[in-house]
UniProtKB/Swiss-Prot annotation:
Annotated EC: 1.3.7.7
Listed name of the protein: Light-independent protochlorophyllide reductase subunit B
Pathway where it operates: Porphyrin-containing compound metabolism; bacteriochlorophyll biosynthesis (light-independent)
Keywords: 4Fe-4S, ATP-binding, Bacteriochlorophyll biosynthesis, Chlorophyll biosynthesis, Iron, Iron-sulfur, Metal-binding, Nucleotide-binding, Oxidoreductase, Photosynthesis
GO molecular function: 4 iron, 4 sulfur cluster binding; ATP binding; metal ion binding; oxidoreductase activity, acting on iron-sulfur proteins as donors; oxidoreductase activity, acting on the CH-CH group of donors, iron-sulfur protein as acceptor
Organism lineage string: Bacteria, Pseudomonadati, Chlorobiota, Chlorobiia, Chlorobiales
Length: 525
């Protein structure tokens, strides 16, 4: 029944296609029932690129099964004749796994040269999006990476940047800007924009940068083990992490450079990393000490997402913005131990590990934090609860695939995140003022509606009604409801809940103005 609800991770096909759709001259052939090619709609809706997704479906039909035939060989021939890919990756589906079809044998019957075919026989029942993507990228690197001479000047590989990646192009631009300032060129970005020839050149780089634990680090480890290409695994999210990342990159490049007889790379002046080349590279350090941001030390944040982002965001919010972390979690169980280790000392309790968005929504409702950093699922949950939320990692929706420059990595990314945090927490003041001064000459009306206890309808001049009690909640008098409306909307639900708890503990059957005032005093309001 889980498929009837949202899922944090997509299927294995989703991960496979994220890799192949990122590359040039690579096509995916999915052997599955009709309708499983829905993935193409995802890319055309979200990906801001002019190319159509490089994916075809080899349809599994009941008639073909009854006749003991398969359409896969013919589909491979059609793909070869129409698209002329350098490589076709054949992906199984749950249906073909149940049928126990031999995809290697079927591919051999197609007549397409075997060096242009790759069967990625992942178990579609057990493997999900990120694991499938990481596995396919690693398989491609193992197949094509070839020994070659090091580049004359210092270069790096950037691994793990894939189609539908969070703020993909902006993050790549930010990383490239940092490297350019160091005088370092990019050898290969993979899989995004890479072809087969690029994969062959991976061992020529001096260093591999793999900032995402979910995708790319396994392939980077293979390059290091097989070809001796060192790897930098750090994620430059935040000002201090970016500085540490730069120092680590310089140190590792200079280690290789010493063997090559190259001139050592020196850390430039910090202003060299800024957009204008004259000012500080990020405004976060001073912004965090302003009166506006110092008030954030009392604000509580909850973070939920993939492993890389959860760790990086928790550290950024606490270390650089001074917010209180009331909890964090991840939907990637296989990376949970790493997240726990990285966040040791940052969390007041245990790390939350779940694939059920309902569990995350319940924690948010119970804690009512001042800010939630999560996924598209948390955005939906927080909307119902009037809790500020910013999306920081997949799964995402169209508003997180932007044309503009909004990186999350590097110094530029630190500024973007700080702005998003500030806006997410602070905006809403206008709505609160409308709630508070709703009858001060505003030229709009809302339909009258009866209050919860069946009394007279609210006046037409009244702005947004107070939050209605949940099912089974306590009754409120009209006067108490009016007082509740003067509470900012983004904490109104929490105030209602706390007041009702106070009333129940004190034997009150309903919330009156007097009960509301006593509750406010007892809670320190």
């Amino acid at each position: 029944m889980r498929l009837a609800f949202w899922l944090y991770e997509g299927t294995a096909l989703h991960g496979i296609s994220r890799v192949t759709n990122s590359m040039k001259g690579v096509h995916t052939v999915y052997h599955a029932p009709q309708g499983d090619d829905y993935i193409t709609a995802t890319y055309t809706m979200l990906e801001r690129t002019p190319e159509f997704p490089a994916l075809s479906i080899s349809v599994v039909r009941g008639r073909d099964l009854a006749q003991g035939v398969s359409r896969l060989p013919a589909t491979l021939q059609q793909v070869e004749e129409h698209y002329h890919p350098e490589l076709s990756v054949i992906a199984p589906s749950c249906s073909t796994a149940l049928l126990q079809e031999d995809l290697h044998q079927l591919a051999a019957q197609s007549g397409v040269p075997q060096d242009k075919l790759m069967v990625y026989a992942v178990n579609p029942f057990r493997v999900t999006e990120n694991e499938a993507a990481d596995g396919l990228l690693t398989a491609l690197v193992k197949r094509y990476a070839a020994e070659g001479p090091k580049t004359a000047a210092p270069t790096v590989n950037l691994l793990g940047f894939t189609s539908l990646g969070f703020h993909l192009k902006a993050n790549l631009t930010s990383i490239r800007r940092l490297l350019t300032t160091l005088g370092v060129k990019v050898n290969v970005v993979a899989p995004w924009g890479a072809g087969i020839a690029d994969l062959k050149r991976l061992p020529e780089a001096w260093l591999t940068i793999a900032p995402f634990r979910e995708i790319g680090q396994t392939a980077a480890a293979y390059l290091e083990e097989t070809f001796g290409v060192p790897t930098e695994y750090g994620t430059p999210l935040g000002v201090e992490p970016t500085l540490r990342w730069l120092r680590a990159v310089i140190e590792k490049l200079n280690t290789v450079g010493a063997k090559e007889g190259a001139t050592p790379i020196a850390m430039p002046e910090l202003h060299a990393f800024s957009l204008d080349g004259m000012s500080a590279p990020s405004g976060v350090p001073w912004f965090a000490r302003t009166a506006d941001m110092e008030s954030f030390s009392n604000k509580k944040a909850f973070v939920f997402g993939d492993a890389t982002t959860t760790v990086a965001m928790v550290k950024f919010l606490r270390d650089e913005l001074g917010m209180q972390i009331i909890g964090a979690g991840t939907y990637l169980e296989r990376h949970a131990d790493w997240v726990r280790k990285e966040l040791d000392g940052y969390l007041p309790g245990a790390l939350m590990v779940t694939e059920r968005f309902q569990d995350v929504a319940q924690v948010i409702e119970d804690e009512m934090p001042d800010l939630v950093c999560g996924t598209q699922m948390e955005r939906h949950s927080c909307r119902k609860l009037d809790v500020p939320c910013m999306v920081v990692c997949p799964p995402t929706h169209i508003e997180n695939h932007l044309l503009g420059y909004y990186p999350f990595l590097g110094f530029d990314g630190a500024d973007v995140i700080a702005d998003r945090v500030y806006i997410s927490c602070k905006l809403g003041l206008e709505k609160h003022l409308i709630d508070f001064f709703g009858d001060a000459g505003l030229e709009y009306e809302e339909p009258s509606a009866s209050s919860e206890n069946g009394s007279a309808p609210l006046s037409a001049g009244t702005a947004t009604p107070a939050a209605a009690p949940e099912e089974g909640g306590m009754a409120w008098t009209d006067e108490a409801e009016t007082m509740l409306k003067k509470v900012p909307f983004f904490v109104r639900k929490k105030v209602r809940k706390n007041t009702e708890n106070f009333a129940e503990e004190n034997g009150e059957s309903r919330v009156s103005v007097e009960v509301f005032r006593r509750a406010k005093e007892s809670l320190g309001g």
